[in-house]
Amino acid sequence: DHLPPASPDSPNRPTGLVPLGVFVAVDTDESVTVTVPRPDMGQGPRTSLAMTVAEELEVDWTAVRVRQAPAGSEYGDQTSGGSTSTRVHHRGMLLAGATAREMLVRAAAAAWGVPRESCRATAGTVEHSPTGRRLTYGSLAESAAAMGVPPASEVTLKSPAEYTIVGRPTSRIDNPDVVTGRAVYGSDVRVPG
């Protein structure tokens, strides 16, 4: 049979996280959870797509957690094959990270009553450049989510020349779960009946 779509009260939905769009959520402990839409069949999209989001979000890679998307149309095509996951989702995940960053910057600017242009995201915080004041992503997440997702036309992607995470060597983010047996695979899922 098949797995039903995730509902708001589903155990597959993370708790304690503030969603900033479909693929990014921020917690008050300053961690960021990236929901990856494609299963990992060995090529590492859980790591590469999370790196892509972290790059645009301006968050430390060590603060990133990954969650596999549950069944649901909001996550788009969830198939895997032909080593296409990273190629197909790269730009969309860049946009997801950049959109979350823009939401957090706007929330900080509103909190300080300053122009958005005077604020910038850096290392999991938003800084007001003229004064050096900072607010953490965790402290801004609720107000950022309440402001809503800006249109893509109002979101700017970084230049690849500015990348500090993408293109750098790293271990796969899910290696600890794989080697300790905590990773959940399709064969681990039990459907009632």
For each feature predicted by the language model, list its residue ranges.
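Cofactor-binding beta-sheet edge motifs in enzyme active sites
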Residues: 1-193
